[in-house]
């Protein structure tokens, strides 16, 4: 690269360009994984059925 990536203008439509909105998107009401953690998704069967579960 001949120029740093930080020199590129942001177009505003990417999540990284909107940190305030990005922080609002991780509320328990909107995120599927929060409810699973509260209910205890750490059984082997849930980990098999839900690959990528954060508590597995």
From Swiss-Prot:
Residues 9-40 form a propeptide. It is found in: Secreted. It holds the Pfam family Conotoxin. Its main location: secreted. Expressed by the venom duct. Residues 1-22 are annotated as: Disordered. Residues 1-8 form the signal peptide. Keywords: Disulfide bond, Secreted, Signal, Toxin. GO terms for cellular component: extracellular region. One of its GO terms (molecular function) is toxin activity. Disulfide bonds join 41-55, 42-53, 47-56. The cysteine framework is III (CC-C-C-CC). Belongs to the conotoxin M superfamily. This is Conotoxin reg3.9. It comes from Conus regius.
């Amino acid at each position: 690269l001949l120029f740093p990536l930080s020199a590129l203008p942001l177009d505003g439509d990417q999540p990284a360009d909107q940190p305030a909105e990005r922080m609002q998107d991780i509320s328990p009401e909107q995120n599927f994984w929060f409810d699973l953690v509260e209910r205890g998704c750490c059984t082997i069967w849930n980990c098999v059925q839900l690959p990528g579960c954060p508590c597995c």
